[in-house]
């Protein structure tokens, strides 16, 4: 995810406590060192919890939030209204369980990547690269 964020000019990566440590030796190696190129921070602290506090903070700072999720009400990632938004925060879940229902409910948009018949999902690294593009 960090390598894609660096390659595709993302402004920053926000992490929760559930994320892997980006400074772990293997994470640095897998990211090809891009963890040192992209600004990042944890969105949680003693005053802000995830998901509710973090989502509130993003909205307070003027971000529209985008949940990457396969749902019937999801808009396509190439939907024009997404391109019109000035500040987007892309919310990614785990590969197995995805995002919690409460997190998706707090997002301004739920977005899907159109895929060929018979393929229903991408891993989170591939999906993030498509979303960042």
Explain the meaning of each model-derived region.
Residues 59-62, 86, 126:
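Generic low-complexity, intrinsically disordered sequence content enriched
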Residues 1-73:
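RNA substrate-binding interface of SAM-dependent RNA methyltransferases
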